[in-house]
């Protein structure tokens, strides 16, 4: 898995064409109206839907207001620099309501649950589950066969660009509402208890808990049984 450099992300955002896309439901004498070069129109008779950039469509609405009886505008962003990831080719299970930005890498058979938010430059390894309402900040990297619990936060690092991102190695389980701060590495096979706030590196095959998180024991058979990763949930 690759990790996107912070300066690459900054350059990507800086140089991207900022976008304010809208969807307009419109009614009126619409024949011959030019809604702008970026617009896609789906018009039948005197009603239709127009997709495009607000600046262009706004100008068309104003210029043709005498022909237009009514319209409703849907808009969910303003001068957005980063589009959402095109999910159609991703070999993973991604549930409705997940928000995944472009330039995110998602491994095969990963699972992204409802309400999860994954920012630019993040990496999700093969077979890893990101549970409901979890947040992966910019450049956060999660290895293979992990579970990031509901409401957990892996802090993002884009600025300052020299800062080290969160790295979660393979086979890690992170409990609900845990927080992993910038620069922390969670070692292979470790378990982070629910609600823990992790401010320093976690050794492999240990269990950490508390605020701030501290090692409370080594992984044992009882812990493995309680934190087992079920491959059946990752089948496509």
From Swiss-Prot:
One of its GO terms (molecular function) is tetrahydrodipicolinate N-acetyltransferase activity. Pfam families: DapH_N, Hexapep, Hexapep_2. It comes from the Bacteria. Its EC number is 2.3.1.89. InterPro entries: DapH (IPR019873), DapH_N (IPR013710), Hexapep (IPR001451), Hexapep_transf_CS (IPR018357), Trans_hexapeptide_repeat (IPR050179), Trimer_LpxA-like_sf (IPR011004). It catalyses: (S)-2,3,4,5-tetrahydrodipicolinate + acetyl-CoA + H2O = L-2-acetamido-6-oxoheptanedioate + CoA. It is an enzyme of class 2 (transferase). CDD domains: LbH_THP_succinylT. Keywords: Acyltransferase, Amino-acid biosynthesis, Diaminopimelate biosynthesis, Lysine biosynthesis, Repeat, Transferase. Pathway: Amino-acid biosynthesis; L-lysine biosynthesis via DAP pathway; LL-2,6-diaminopimelate from (S)-tetrahydrodipicolinate (acetylase route): step 1/3. SUPFAM superfamilies: Trimeric LpxA-like enzymes. One of its GO terms (biological process) is diaminopimelate biosynthetic process. Belongs to the transferase hexapeptide repeat family. DapH subfamily. HAMAP family: DapH. Catalyzes the transfer of an acetyl group from acetyl-CoA to tetrahydrodipicolinate. This is 2,3,4,5-tetrahydropyridine-2,6-dicarboxylate N-acetyltransferase. It comes from Geobacillus sp. (strain WCH70). The lineage of its organism: Bacteria, Bacillati, Bacillota, Bacilli, Bacillales.
């Amino acid at each position: 898995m690759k990790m996107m450099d912070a300066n690459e992300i900054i350059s990507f955002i800086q140089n991207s064409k900022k976008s304010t896309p809208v969807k307009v439901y419109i009614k009126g004498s619409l024949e011959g109206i030019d809604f702008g070069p970026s617009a896609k129109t789906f018009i039948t008779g005197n009603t239709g839907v127009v997709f495009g950039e607000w600046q262009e469509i706004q100008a068309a609405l104003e210029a043709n207001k005498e022909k237009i009886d009514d319209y409703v505008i849907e808009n969910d962003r303003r001068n957005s620099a980063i589009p959402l990831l095109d999910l159609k080719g991703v070999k993973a299970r991604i549930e409705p309501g997940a928000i995944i930005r472009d330039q995110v890498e998602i491994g095969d058979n990963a699972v992204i649950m409802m309400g999860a938010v994954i920012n630019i430059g993040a990496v999700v390894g093969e077979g890893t589950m990101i549970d409901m309402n979890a947040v992966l900040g910019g450049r956060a990297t999660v290895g293979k066969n992990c579970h990031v619990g509901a409401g957990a936060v892996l802090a993002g690092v884009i600025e300052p660009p020299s800062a080290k991102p969160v790295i979660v190695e393979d086979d890690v389980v992170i409990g609900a509402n845990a927080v992993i701060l910038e620069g922390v590495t969670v070692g292979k096979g470790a378990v982070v208890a629910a609600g823990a706030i992790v401010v320093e590196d976690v050794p492999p095959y240990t269990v950490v808990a508390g605020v701030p998180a501290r090692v409370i024991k080594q992984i044992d058979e009882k812990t493995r049984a309680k934190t087992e990763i079920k491959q059946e949930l990752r089948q496509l």
